[in-house]
A protein has these predicted regions:
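Long, compositionally biased, intrinsically disordered segments
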Residues: 29-271
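Bacterial Sec-dependent N-terminal signal peptides
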Residues: 1-34
Length: 271
């Protein structure tokens, strides 16, 4: 039996990631979003390269990639102090790897990736910074969210004040997660991250952030933090995203063990 595993969001240190559902829609605000990553690299001094990896459903007739992607800058008191934009860089189609003989891979699974990057200089700040990007929507077919057609995403990274003195960079994940699993079959996959500075990373299941709505699909500027988590549907939670199925993550290694039972599209968060 076919099962779609969809990792909706990951918050790890100052790193945020989201992989959302592959769903078709006829409305521009709807489920073209498949997900995204956001992280930064310190280039020296107060200069940073900001990277956002945005994923969308190739076959969706919803909105395309944003031609201009807005990023809002807040200080540590959650007050907006700046904003910058990144033009659309073009996209590539990702390979969907699936070699389980339980089912033939459906032909309607296709993911595009666009990597938005910009180099910015930020002045020293005693409170640090939060950079945010928000977009809606995930799509009506996500199984474990209360109102997925009105749930968007927030990509957020925090640059602490200590980063300016030591030129710190944020963590980022090394593997694109699987999009397709088979129900009733256990699978393990490596969902670990790397930190360029060698900082210790600890993993746990958590609730993804929402962001935007069907009324305001692309907030510009983004709303200030703190951000609200998604609203789970009945019988689901951050630590029980599969309902009757099982999902665990090793807090040290980042290895995920999944045993889905009911077919569907599932939101799963890792912090």
């Amino acid at each position: 039996m076919l099962f779609f595993f969809v990792k909706l969001e990951v918050r790890l240190k100052r790193f945020l990631s989201l992989i959302s559902a592959l769903v078709l829609s006829t409305q521009l605000y709807a489920s073209h979003i498949v997900g995204g990553d956001m992280y930064y690299d310190c280039l020296g001094g107060n200069t940073y390269q900001i990277t956002l990896k945005i994923y969308r459903d190739c076959l969706s007739d919803g909105a395309d990639f944003d031609p201009i992607l807005p990023v809002t800058v807040f200080n540590g008191l959650n007050v907006q102090i700046d904003q910058f934009t990144i033009p659309y860089p073009g996209s590539v189609t990702l390979d969907v790897l699936f070699d389980n003989p339980c089912i033939t891979l459906p032909s309607d699974i296709c993911v595009e990736e666009a990597i938005y990057q910009k180099t910015v200089t930020l002045p020293d700040s005693p409170t640090g910074y939060t950079l945010s990007y928000q977009r809606c929507c995930r799509g009506p077919a996500v199984t474990n969210l209360n109102d997925p057609d009105d749930e968007g995403l927030t990509l957020q990274i925090d640059i602490p004040p200590t980063s300016f003195a030591v030129c710190n960079s944020s963590a980022r994940f090394t593997n694109y997660p699987p999009l397709v699993l088979c129900s009733g079959q256990e699978i393990e996959f490596d969902h670990s991250a790397i930190d360029p500075d060698g900082d210790l990373l600890v993993y746990e299941l958590c609730s993804p952030f929402g962001g935007g709505s069907s009324v305001l699909p692309a907030p510009d500027p983004a709303s200030p933090p703190p951000y609200d988590p998604v609203v789970w549907g009945p019988g689901f939670s951050a630590t029980d995203p599969f309902g009757d199925g099982d999902l665990t993550i090793d807090p040290v290694t980042g290895m995920v063990t999944a045993l889905p039972e009911a077919p569907g599209l599932y939101a799963v968060g890792v912090c």
